[in-house]
């Protein structure tokens, strides 16, 4: 199988959108392909609608890939979003692929204490919103579970994991834990994050030495 990792950001004061994409082989997590795609930002920043600003470059990064991934991990949110449509959900809808949001910070919701051991998690819950389906499951407080606050490494702040598209919460957590190495981030988003932070404006495609 193939797992993709994606990191989207802005450059030139927001004028340029940059999407960094890595494609890894599962289960070895060997890097097969990587792409950095830049294009002019088409939409102004609107709170709650950031994914609409990010999606054109994100989709553009997938075009040169020689193979289609089976799963995508995105640095950002899935349904752990006020409109239940973070960038991971949005991208999954466009590509019709399973996606997982792996956020370094919380966008919305509440959570209790996160256990200290690696792989442990606590639910991220939010009040019910009109975007939630009619048959959404509610906890004993009448709240919706929108993600997991995951201890990905002992002694480090947790990650905010949420299903994006075609993915359950348990499945999302399981995949992230299986892709953890020695650092806080799972390998797909760690490598995408590293690729995104490389200096220089050269668009790269293909396999590069790690």
Predicted regions and their residues:
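Glycine-rich phosphate/pyrophosphate-binding loops
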Residues: 95-114
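Short, well-ordered, mixed-charge alpha-helical segments that flank or form enzyme active sites
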Residues: 13, 80-83, 107-111, 156
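Catalytic-site beta-strand/loop segments enriched in glycine and acidic/polar residues
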Residues: 59-90, 95-97
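Flexible, glycine/proline-enriched loop segments at strand-loop-helix junctions
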Residues: 44-49, 74-82, 156-163
């Amino acid at each position: 199988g193939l797992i993709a990792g994606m990191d989207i950001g802005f450059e030139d004061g927001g004028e340029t959108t940059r999407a960094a994409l890595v494609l890894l082989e599962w289960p070895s997590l060997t890097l097969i392909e990587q792409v950095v795609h830049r294009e002019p930002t088409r939409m102004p920043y609107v709170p709650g609608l950031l994914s609409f600003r990010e999606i054109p470059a994100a989709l553009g990064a997938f075009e040169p890939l020689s193979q289609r991934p089976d799963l995508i991990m995105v640095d950002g949110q899935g349904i752990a979003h006020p409109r239940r449509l973070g960038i991971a959900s949005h991208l999954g809808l466009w590509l019709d692929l399973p996606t997982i949001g792996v956020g370094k910070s919380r966008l919305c919701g509440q959570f209790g204490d996160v256990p200290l051991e690696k792989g442990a998690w606590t639910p991220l819950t939010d009040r019910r919103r009109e975007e939630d389906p009619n048959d959404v499951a509610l906890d004993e407080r009448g709240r919706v579970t929108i993600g997991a606050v995951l201890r990905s490494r002992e002694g480090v702040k947790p990650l905010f994991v949420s299903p994006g598209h075609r993915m359950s919460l348990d499945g999302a957590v399981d995949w992230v834990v299986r892709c953890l190495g020695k650092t806080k981030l799972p390998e797909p988003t760690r490598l995408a994050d590293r690729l995104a932070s490389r200096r220089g404006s050269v668009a790269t495609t293909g396999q590069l030495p790690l």
